[in-house]
Swiss-Prot record:
Protein's UniProt keywords contain ATP-binding: yes
Tissue expression remark: Detected at higher levels in caput epididymal spermatazoa than in cauda epididymal spermatazoa (at protein level).
UniProt superkingdom: Eukaryota
Gene Ontology molecular-function annotations: ATP binding; ATP-dependent protein folding chaperone
PANTHER family attached to this UniProt entry: HEAT SHOCK PROTEIN 70KDA
Family according to the record: Belongs to the heat shock protein 70 family.
Official protein name in the record: Heat shock 70 kDa protein 1-like
Pfam family name, one: HSP70
Primary gene name: HSPA1L
Organism annotation: Mesocricetus auratus
Keywords, alphabetical: ATP-binding, Chaperone, Nucleotide-binding, Stress response
């Protein structure tokens, strides 16, 4: 259905007008004043409403589920530092023990080679 509204002007006169959906496109609308008689309509007369809202909600629920899964997979569980930067970064991570695993230079080189492969 097309919503009808009543506007108040500065002179307190009532001026009825309608906002119509032109050509069944949700972004196209027009304002008409005066008496108008609708002779025909085309397109989907049930566009919008509860069905449309439910589709939008379903879409965004799925999108948020996807984002949540991606965030959970990206969580950092352990931080391993190689070199002398441990003391500098420990304050940044609220005193968290950053070196739960010890990596020697030899192990570091082996890991680098595997990563580059």
């Amino acid at each position: 259905t097309t919503p009808s509204y009543v506007a108040f002007t500065d002179t307190e006169r009532l001026w009825p007008f309608q906002v119509i959906n032109e050509a069944g496109k949700p972004k196209d609308a027009g304002v008409i004043a005066g008496l108008n008689v609708l002779r025909a309509t085309a397109g989907d007369t049930h566009l919008g409403g509860e069905d449309f809202d439910n589709r939008l909600v379903s879409h965004f629920v799925e999108e948020f589920k996807r984002l949540r899964t991606a965030c959970e997979r990206a969580k950092i569980h352990d931080i391993v530092l190689v070199g002398g930067s441990t003391r500098l970064l420990q304050d940044y991570f609220n005193g968290r023990d950053l070196n739960k695993i010890t990596i020697t230079n030899d192990k570091g080189r082996l890991s680098k080679e595997e990563i580059e492969r």
